[in-house]
Amino acid sequence: PTFVKEFRSAVEQAKTLGVSLQVILGLGDSPDFKSLIREIRNRQPPVTYWLVRGGDPSDFHAAQKQLSAIGQGSKMGVTRVTNFVDLNRARPESDLVQAVGFAINPQIHAFDHASIVESLPMHAEVVENARQFTGDRPLVIGPITMTPQLLDGNDEYGGLLRGGALPTFVDGRQVEPFTAAWTLGSLKYLADASVDSATFFETVGWNGLMDIDDVSARPQEFPSKPGSVF
């Protein structure tokens, strides 16, 4: 299965960096729990949270039943990979939900530099709103990115290419100091709101902290070189 390769890569990176993983599970119509459990037993991944994507309670309970049997000590939760609005529309009600998450990105309605910066205080506000119905359960925020990533109910990335140059889940400003400054601003407001965890971007690649080493030429709209640190 495709997810096995991605899971192995994530586990290897986490162990190399000495960090834990928060794994988002998109179950789909026929979830392959057998392959996932085999990978968990073989690789002993440092997973802190398993977060079931979407608002379907049956998906959460299916994952909780399968993963609780292996006794890894990780917490089971739910998340929305779109934004807080979708989480608020389908609030988790099960007492078995041990953690709650949602994604943050600044480009739903506006895309210019000023609007992106002006929306930073909202990062704290949505956390405070979430606390009203999540109680004392950990709030696990992420992915925090410059553009929307996965769409709930859709296993594909953002989809169409923007003007034929960049995928919709990529922003050319990822390589700019502006994004580094925006990240610091987001960290400030999320820390003020006392979130339990915040995951920004990816390790390497389009949405990473640096580009991959074996990348071919990037489009002009994404001025990066192999191994560049953003």
Task: Give residue spans per PLM region.
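Aromatic-lined substrate-binding rim segments of carbohydrate-active enzymes
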Residues: T2-N42, P57-S74, E118-L120
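Short, acidic/polar
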Residues: F7, S30-N42, F84-P92, F178-K188
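Structured alpha-helical segments in the cores of large, soluble enzyme domains
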Residues: F7-A10, V126-Q132, S186-K188
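Short, well-ordered coil/turn segments that N-cap beta-strands
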Residues: K15-L21, Q44-T48, Q72-K75, L96-Q98, ...
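Structural recognition of alpha->loop->beta junctions
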Residues: R38-W50, P92-A103, G185-S197
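Noncatalytic carbohydrate-binding groove/subsite architecture in carbohydrate-active enzymes
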Residues: R53-P177
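Aromatic/acidic polysaccharide-binding cleft in carbohydrate-active enzymes
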Residues: G142-S228
